[in-house]
């Protein structure tokens, strides 16, 4: 087995010693904070749980009182000026949960003030009114309900709203996504039999507040463990509210949380308590994984926390959760990793037996959706096993799952246990760096083929590059302390990887600036990044991340060698030459050298993937065309524009668009070199195109495109049959693409129309070229059947692949971003996107023609400048320079209208979405603009150099 990845040595011995002392202090304080009965917890206070604890009444000697009046006062102190509680920029759902629960608590206290006499009814009424107004405002713009990470939201929010409606004596709260919430509620409830909750432990026990009045809480007392319902203060509070028999153990638990939690008696209640196993494993693993050595931080604290984990795994039969009796794969895997780092390894076999699924590991026994970070934690724990080969199947499974997740993630990778995309990004960089290290050393080389290694390398490269590209000027990432730590830890790990040799100075600069910001950052600034029912911070864990980031950033790093076995990371000579060409374009001339080189390297990972599909549709080697050098260029056009605009579209979308670009070039060549000559009679080729498209639409079973129908061509030659098969393969690859079939019927219809027009335009172009080639003069097209305006808006424009590619992209957005809904739903949006498509297509044709004048003249192909509108002006013949100047002016005119159409589309999309305009509305516009940027880049490149293969 190859040696471990060395962290390096401190640049400054005194600074290093300071961090070591701080790390040992953290370990000691965490261990000493551990209570032998109630455990350990440094999670921040949460309004949601505080509100539920504030609603617990208790009757003593026939006198009813609020059990925790300090919680009520905490709610008064934390209400914002706009009437809300818990508003966060990263999640709307948490604010709705906090505000709804706090308003409910105030309503309960307003109806029965009991012993709390220092708040007037007028003040209470005003606070409740402001709270309800805020809640309605939040519900009206709620757009992350389907994407929410928060536990039990499908149960909790409907229950809260129902309780509020009853207390306020008002009809139902109406808001745009209510039907979505109700559907989610029904689907989730369908997975549970409430009667079974009385027997076996169930995840519902974590959210009993959603089942007040629906369950007999007196039958749930046996589920209490050390006074809590699954370590949830809000669920435990609901149990005390709903049970007819008082439970002293539950009261004692909540009193301990009140006194010893993050609120320290001020009324604030932690959202989860305890988090013993979570904190022990995260603190140890975070400190030892990349920053500190075991020798540096060994002591009573480290040994004590390690012992807690060992005993928990022993007592709970090999699988643990964040707290006792809450088993999950996350905490189990992290504990295994932590213990391996302190040289006390525990077998992962039971974890595998309990949590391994068909294609990934589940966090719990059942869950609505899988977790990327859970699988990365499993992978990291397995990579530390001494008998690595025994776990090859699971390593392969989790690596493949992670690659697929990254491949399909649009903009930022997302996970349900952490609100920041930087957390799963950091874990991916850590895990895949380790995977590459083991591949280089031969330990895992047999597991992954070249394509798989390519995707592993691509994932790391993109993860790190996007972290670099999104760093703020002050050195932080959005001003968040813990998230900045995640970013630094990922970048520090990347310094070991050879892919980043060309940009090591930039990478180190990012680390240094992050280090400086982090050192000056106050420990009191909270970063509520972890998710449960709402969002919270874990104090000791946040401190561990800060120390690990500071320590690792201060270490000298040996030469980067990891990843040397991934040859696709080395750009080809064609790409190197291409960079000089791209430098001349208006889009990329302002870019720093490192940024351009980074996109070139990222592009190189896509080239082998494209090469593997190079002849999947069209035969190449016997066609009389030049070598397809554009294959190595295509990936950059998409990657470069994607990085330049910081759009970060998914690899799934990027690759499909790259492949479509490749097919666009190949179709152009194939129709000219093969299909046209084979058919001879172009009317027959027109009929064949219609037949192929109609058959593809009517019969999805023809997806492999290898069997052609004999109808209509009873005596056709084998070559005609082969052409029909080839065109069927192409048509299937576009119209029967998996995501196209999952898109809206309207977007599919648009694609079919544009695709049919594109294919027929090729044949019409062949006819035009044939007539043009028979002319005595090649200077002007003497027999056009349309004016130039008509031609460029029909055959000329449709002949380039822009319009149908645009429609294809809209189908991908419909399927993947919008759950099969129309990409552009209103009639106005549909018109405007068609306008964008048309102007982009016309520009593409004009600039393409501008760049290919010499080739078109040589091959006698019709070019824009051959039309009479360019050859003559006021009866005077125009020379070549004059024609080119006029063509550029018209192209500039089209550019202006494209820009205006894009602006109008953006305004209309915002107006149609109203207050609920959310991330998906913005994303689709970003992707449309990215498509237009790529079109613009091709246009600029055509002006500099003709990119098409020449016909021999």
UniProtKB/Swiss-Prot annotation:
Cofactors required: Mg(2+)
Binding-site residues, Mg(2+) 3: 848-849, 852, 856
Molecular-function annotations in GO: ent-copalyl diphosphate synthase activity; ent-kaurene synthase activity; magnesium ion binding
GO biological process: gibberellin biosynthetic process
Recorded metabolic or biological pathway in which this protein acts: Plant hormone biosynthesis; gibberellin biosynthesis
Residues holding Mg(2+) 1: 668, 672
The keyword Transcription regulation is assigned to this record: no
Keyword terms of this UniProt record: Isomerase, Lyase, Magnesium, Metal-binding
Sites where the protein binds Mg(2+) 2: 668, 672
Residues spanned by motif DEXXE motif: 668-672
InterPro entries assigned: Ent-kaurene_synthase_fun, Terpene_synthase-like, Terpenoid_cyclase/PrenylTrfase
Reactions catalysed according to its record: ent-copalyl diphosphate = ent-kaur-16-ene + diphosphate; (2E,6E,10E)-geranylgeranyl diphosphate = ent-copalyl diphosphate
EC number assigned by the record: 4.2.3.19, 5.5.1.13
Domain notes: The Asp-Asp-Xaa-Xaa-Asp/Glu (DDXXD/E) motif is important for the catalytic activity, presumably through binding to Mg(2+).
Biological function: Catalyzes the conversion of geranylgeranyl diphosphate to the gibberellin precursor ent-kaurene diphosphate in a two step process.
Family, similarity comment: Belongs to the terpene synthase family.
Protein name: Ent-kaur-16-ene synthase
Species whose genome carries this gene: Fusarium fujikuroi
Lineage, opening ranks: Eukaryota, Fungi, Dikarya, Ascomycota, Pezizomycotina
């Amino acid at each position: 087995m190859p040696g471990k990845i060395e962290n390096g040595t401190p640049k400054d011995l005194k600074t290093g010693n300071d961090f070591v002392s701080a790390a040992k202090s953290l370990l000691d304080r965490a261990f000493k904070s551990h209570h032998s009965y109630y455990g350990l917890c440094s999670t921040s206070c949460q309004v949601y749980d505080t509100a539920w604890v504030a609603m617990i009444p208790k009757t003593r000697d026939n006198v009813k009182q609020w059990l925790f009046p300090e919680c009520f006062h905490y709610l008064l102190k934390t209400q914002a000026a706009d009437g809300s509680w818990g508003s966060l920029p990263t999640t709307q759902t948490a604010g709705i949960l906090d505000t709804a629960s706090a308003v409910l608590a105030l309503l309960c206290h307003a109806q029965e003030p009991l012993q709390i006499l220092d708040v007037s009814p007028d003040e209470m009424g005003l606070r409740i009114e402001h709270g309800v107004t805020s809640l309605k405002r939040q519900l009206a713009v709620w757009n992350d309900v389907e994407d929410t990470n928060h536990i039990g939201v499908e149960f909790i929010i409907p229950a809260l709203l129902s309780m509020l409606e009853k207390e306020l004596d008002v009809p139902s709260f109406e808001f745009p996504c209510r039907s979505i919430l109700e559907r989610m509620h029904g689907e989730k409830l369908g997975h549970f039999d409430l009667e079974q909750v009385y027997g076996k432990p169930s995840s519902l026990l974590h959210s009993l507040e959603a089942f007040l009045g629906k369950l007999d809480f007196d039958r749930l007392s046996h589920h209490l463990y050390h006074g809590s319902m699954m370590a949830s203060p809000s669920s435990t509070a609901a149990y005390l509210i709903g049970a007819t028999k008082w439970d002293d153990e539950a009261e004692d638990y909540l009193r301990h949380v009140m006194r010893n939690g993050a609120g320290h008696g001020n009324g604030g209640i932690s959202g989860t308590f305890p988090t013993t196993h979570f904190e022990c494993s995260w603190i140890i693993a975070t400190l030892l994984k990349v920053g500190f050595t075991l020798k540096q931080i060994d002591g009573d604290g480290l040994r004590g926390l390690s012992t807690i984990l060992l005993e928990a795994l022993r007592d709970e039969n090999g699988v643990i959760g964040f707290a006792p009796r809450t088993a999950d794969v996350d905490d189990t895997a992290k504990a295994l990793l932590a213990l391996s780092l302190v040289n006390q390894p525990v077998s992962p076999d039971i974890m595998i037996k309990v949590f391994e699924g068909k294609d990934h590991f589940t966090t719990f026994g059942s869950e609505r959706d899988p977790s990327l970070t859970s699988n990365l934690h499993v992978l990291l724990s397995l990579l530390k096993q001494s008998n690595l080969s025994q776990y090859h199947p699971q390593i392969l499974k989790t690596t493949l799952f992670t690659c697929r997740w990254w491949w399909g993630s649009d903009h930022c990778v997302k996970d349900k246990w952490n609100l920041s995309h930087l957390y799963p990004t950091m874990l991916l960089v850590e895990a895949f760096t380790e995977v590459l290290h083991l591949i280089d050393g031969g330990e895992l080389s047999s597991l992954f083929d070249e394509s798989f290694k390519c995707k592993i390398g691509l994932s790391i490269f993109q993860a790190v590059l996007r972290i670099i590209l999104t760093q703020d000027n002050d050195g932080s990432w959005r001003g968040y302390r813990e998230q900045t730590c995640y970013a630094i830890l990922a970048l520090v790990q990347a310094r070991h990887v050879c892919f980043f040799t060309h940009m090591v100075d930039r990478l180190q600069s990012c680390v240094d600036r992050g280090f400086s910001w982090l050192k000056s950052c106050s420990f009191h600034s909270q970063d509520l990044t972890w998710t449960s029912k709402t969002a919270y911070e874990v104090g000791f864990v946040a401190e561990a991340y800060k120390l690990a980031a500071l320590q690792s950033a201060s270490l000298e790093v040996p030469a980067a060698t990891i990843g040397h076995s991934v040859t696709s990371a080395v750009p080809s000579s064609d790409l190197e030459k291409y960079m000089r060409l791209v430098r001349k374009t208006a889009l990329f001339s302002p870019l720093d050298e490192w940024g351009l080189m980074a996109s070139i390297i990222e592009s190189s990972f896509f080239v082998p993937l494209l090469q593997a599909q190079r002849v999947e549709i069209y035969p190449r080697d016997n066609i009389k065309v030049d070598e397809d050098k554009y294959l190595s260029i295509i990936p950059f056009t998409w990657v470069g524009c994607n990085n330049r605009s910081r759009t970060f579209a998914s690899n799934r979308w990027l690759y499909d668009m790259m492949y479509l670009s490749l097919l666009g070039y190949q179709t152009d060549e194939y129709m000219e070199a093969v299909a046209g000559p084979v058919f001879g009679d172009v009317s027959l080729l027109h009929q064949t195109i219609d037949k192929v498209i109609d058959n593809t639409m009517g019969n999805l079973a023809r997806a492999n495109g290898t069997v052609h129908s004999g109808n209509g061509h009873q005596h056709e030659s084998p070559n005609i049959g082969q052409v029909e098969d080839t065109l069927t393969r192409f048509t299937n690859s576009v119209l029967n693409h998996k995501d196209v079939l999952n898109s809206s019927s309207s977007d599919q219809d648009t694609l079919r129309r544009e695709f049919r027009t594109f294919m027929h335009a090729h044949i019409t172009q062949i006819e035009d070229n044939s007539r043009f080639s028979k002319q005595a003069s090649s200077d002007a097209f003497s027999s056009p059947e349309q004016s130039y305006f008509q031609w460029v808006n029909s055959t000329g424009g449709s002949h380039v692949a822009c319009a149908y590619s645009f429609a294809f992209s809209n189908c991908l957005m419909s399927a993947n971003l919008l759950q099969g809904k129309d990409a552009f739903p209103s009639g106005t949006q549909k018109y405007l996107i068609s306008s964008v498509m048309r102007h982009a297509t016309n520009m593409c044709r004009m600039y393409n023609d501008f760049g290919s004048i010499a080739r078109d003249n040589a091959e006698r192909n019709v070019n824009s400048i051959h039309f009479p509108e360019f050859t003559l002006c006021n009866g005077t013949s125009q020379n070549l320079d004059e024609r080119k100047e006029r063509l550029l002016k018209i192209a500039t005119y089209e550019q202006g209208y494209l820009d205006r159409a894009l602006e109008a589309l953006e305004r209309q999309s915002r107006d149609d979405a109203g207050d609920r305009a959310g991330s998906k509305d913005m994303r689709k516009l970003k992707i449309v603009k990215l498509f237009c940027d790529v079109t613009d880049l091709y246009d600029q490149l055509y002006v500099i150099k003709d990119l098409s293969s020449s016909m021999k």
